[in-house]
From Swiss-Prot:
Modified residues (Phosphothreonine): T2
Site keyed Cleavage: positions: A344, A345
Other observations noted: 2 of the reaction center chlorophylls (ChlD1 and ChlD2) are entirely coordinated by water. Herbicides such as atrazine, BNT, diuron or ioxynil bind in the Q(B) binding site and block subsequent electron transfer.
Propeptide: 345-353
Gene assigned in the entry: psbA-A
Residues with N-acetylthreonine modification: T2
Site (Tyrosine radical intermediate): Y161
Protein known as: Photosystem II protein D1
InterPro entries, per database record: D1/D2, Photo_II_D1/D2_sf, Photo_RC_L/M, Photo_RC_L/M_CS, PSII_D1
Chain positions recorded as [CaMn4O5] cluster binding sites: D170, E189, H332, E333, D342, A344
Residues that coordinate or bind pheophytin a: Y126
Record-linked SUPFAM superfamilies: Bacterial photosystem II reaction centre, L and M subunits
Keyword annotations of the record: Acetylation, Calcium, Chlorophyll, Chloroplast, Chromophore, Electron transport, Herbicide resistance, Iron, Magnesium, Manganese, Membrane, Metal-binding, Oxidoreductase, Phosphoprotein, Photosynthesis, Photosystem II, Plastid, Thylakoid, Transmembrane, Transmembrane helix, Transport
Record organism: Pinus contorta (Shore pine)
Length: 353
């Protein structure tokens, strides 16, 4: 009898726990994805803060030349970063217990791998949690689909690119100047500016900013006034009201006359789908571009592609970009390579008689 009562209480406790986890009445929804999201993001955030403040220099290139990234080792907010895991580790899974000591783990950049892997798991679970909450509220799933774009972008630079290049040391550093360094080296080695998927990403991000500004300003300029001239127009709005808060017909008429009629949406659903889909598709393409360049399927190479009738090269902007790429490649990891990879791959020219 005692065993049966204990079993019932245990089952009842588990049932109450499940109800609490999946309840949409909580101030912050947890969900089953949240059970994994909360510890992984807390771990990533905690280690990031500690390492950004106090981590010792990391031997990123595996050549016994540590690079300082933390505040206590001479950096400021702009120059500081979590330095990627050493090239000596490559793609090996490198938890603390795999190192001979904590000092060795820090020297080889163990915190970077810990932060990145927990962060990627956490943001993927955040996306799943968005879907889970939408499902429980009877909403459609497109919020999670939109969030998949930044998740794909983060996965591309922190996981896919290191896998393609063979080492976590090629991942993006977790800091401002480190991000710029990553961008410059990426351009030097992969010519990303000449990759069509990057161009689509630029169109997505800048276009999304433009459309967001246009939409916000049009809506704000066509609010239906429910107040006097002496009161704020915002005071006429009640949260959850059934009436429209702005006049879409007026906004459509304004924009249609500003450009032309069919440049303006007259359907609010189509408009908001477009506002979501444009930047999301652009960022998807950029993430796909990074993932293909990870395996060295690089941007277009139009170097010395224009020649005159005598076969002499007529330089184009593509040739100027190529010269800049070579210069950037010469500068980066200056002590790790005896010669830039692109130049080292060229056969030597015989100058003998």
């Amino acid at each position: 009898m005692t065993a049966i009562i204990e079993r019932r209480e245990s089952a009842n406790l588990w049932s109450r726990f499940c109800d609490w986890i999946t309840s949409t009445e909580n101030r912050l929804y947890i969900g089953w994805f949240g059970v994994l999201m909360i510890p992984t993001l807390l771990t990533a955030t905690s280690v990031f803060i500690i390492a950004f403040i106090a981590a010792p220099p990391v031997d990123i290139d595996g050549i016994r030349e540590p690079v300082s990234g933390s505040l206590l080792y001479g950096n400021n907010i702009i120059s500081g970063a979590i330095i990627p895991t050493s090239a000596a580790i490559g793609l090996h899974f490198y938890p603390i217990w795999e190192a001979a000591s904590v000092d060795e783990w820090l020297y080889n950049g163990g915190p970077y791998e810990l932060i990145v892997l927990h962060f990627l798991l956490g943001v993927a679970c955040y996306m799943g949690r968005e879907w889970e909450l939408s499902f429980r509220l009877g909403m459609r799933p497109w919020i999670a689909v939109a969030y998949s774009a930044p998740v794909a972008a983060a996965t591309a630079v922190f996981l896919i690119y290191p896998i393609g290049q063979g080492s976590f040391s090629d991942g993006m550093p977790l800091g401002i100047s480190g991000t710029f360094n990553f961008m410059i080296v990426f351009q030097a080695e992969h010519n990303i500016l000449m990759h069509p998927f990057h161009m689509l990403g630029v169109a997505g991000v800048f276009g999304g900013s433009l459309f967001s500004a246009m939409h916000g300003s049009l809506v704000t300029s066509s609010l239906i006034r429910e107040t006097t001239e002496n009161q704020s127009a915002n005071a006429g709005y009640k949260f959850g009201q059934e009436e429209e808060t702005y006049n879409i017909v007026a906004a459509h008429g304004y924009f249609g006359r500003l450009i032309f009629q069919y440049a303006s949406f007259n359907n609010s659903r189509s408009l908001h789908f477009f506002l979501a889909a444009w930047p999301v598709a652009g960022i998807w393409f950029t993430a796909l571009g990074i993932s293909t360049m990870a395996f060295n399927l690089n941007g277009f190479n139009f170097n010395q592609s224009v020649v005159d009738s005598q076969g002499r090269v007529i330089n184009t902007w593509a040739d100027i970009i190529n010269r800049a790429n070579l210069g950037m490649e010469v500068m980066h990891e200056r002590n790790a390579h005896n010669f830039p990879l692109d130049l080292a791959a060229v056969e030597s020219i015989s100058i003998g008689g």
